[in-house]
UniProtKB/Swiss-Prot annotation:
Ranges annotated as spanning the membrane: none
Catalytic residues identified in the record: D149
Protein name: tRNA (guanine-N(7)-)-methyltransferase
Listed InterPro entries: SAM-dependent_MTases_sf, tRNA_(Gua-N-7)_MeTrfase_Trmb, tRNA_methyltr_TrmB_bact
Residues binding S-adenosyl-L-methionine, per UniProt: E74, E99, D126, D149
GO molecular function, one term: tRNA (guanine(46)-N7)-methyltransferase activity
Length: 244
């Protein structure tokens, strides 16, 4: 999730089966950024408490969080503002956030320290590698993908994170009844998401008309989104539920 239209923290899409050597197409761009004092504080003091390292083994998140609770996985939380808002509003839910942009990671960690929140853990690496290796199958209640990079140019469409392989990976990680919730402000990408997910087996579109849902109350409105609304820009939300 991000307050900018292009969140840099999406994963890499495998072009081949996982059992074979993989070439990957990155759906994110690593961007350098200057750290503020608060962001550096977050990394220095918050990472030892809330940070997680990529592992080749499935992680016991019940042990990591110290409880059993509904679990939400967020790809690309940007500067972490919406993540903090969701975590504060739902203390009974555990959040796993992934972001490669270090200032954003620092900002979220600093916010966790400042607000005294304990229901968030953070990775700073390729989100799809975390899903593949660290997250058990059928263990997530929700997966959030808010405002991923739309890769506007046609020659870059292969970089979009939402592809058939992504849909299948997410389906494996969601519980039956779990939901993939996506949002974008770029209508052609919204249509692309809809096409990919409508063709993906094992899902049900929760939209009554089979297209898009109204903005769910649980998704915070970002500053970028408010600016867009004032300019008449649209935002499209999609919710697909795993049914088998």
């Amino acid at each position: 999730m991000s307050d900018t239209p292009q969140s840099p923290a999406q994963g890499s899409l495998a072009e081949h089966d996982e059992a074979r050597p993989m070439r990957t197409v990155k759906s994110f761009v690593m961007r350098a950024g200057r750290m503020t004092e608060g962001q550096q504080r977050g990394l220095d003091l918050g990472w030892p408490k809330f940070g997680l390292e990529l592992s080749d083994e499935v992680q016991d998140f019940d042990a990591i969080f110290g409880r059993q609770a509904p679990r939400t996985f967020e790809i690309g939380f940007g500067m972490g503002h919406s993540t903090l808002e969701m975590a504060a509003a739902a203390p009974d839910i555990d959040f796993i956030g992934v972001e490669v942009h270090k200032p954003g990671v620092g900002a979220l960690l600093n916010g966790l320290l400042t607000q005294g929140l304990g229901n968030v853990r953070v990775y700073s690496c390729d989100a799809l590698e975390v899903l593949r290796h660290c997250v058990a199958d059928a263990s997530l209640d929700r997966l959030l993908l808010f405002f991923p990079d739309p890769w506007h140019k046609k020659r870059h469409h292969k970089r979009r994170i939402v592809q058939p392989e992504f849909a299948e990976l997410v389906r494996r990680k969601l519980k039956v009844g779990g939901v993939l919730h996506m949002a974008t402000d770029w209508e052609p990408y919204a249509e692309h998401m809809l096409d990919v997910m409508s063709a993906a087996p094992g899902y049900r579109n929760q939209a009554e008309d089979g297209r898009f849902v109204a903005r769910p109350q649980e998704r915070p409105v970002t500053k970028f989104e408010r600016r867009g609304e004032r300019l008449g820009h649209g935002v499209w939300d999609l919710k697909f539920e795993r049914i088998d």
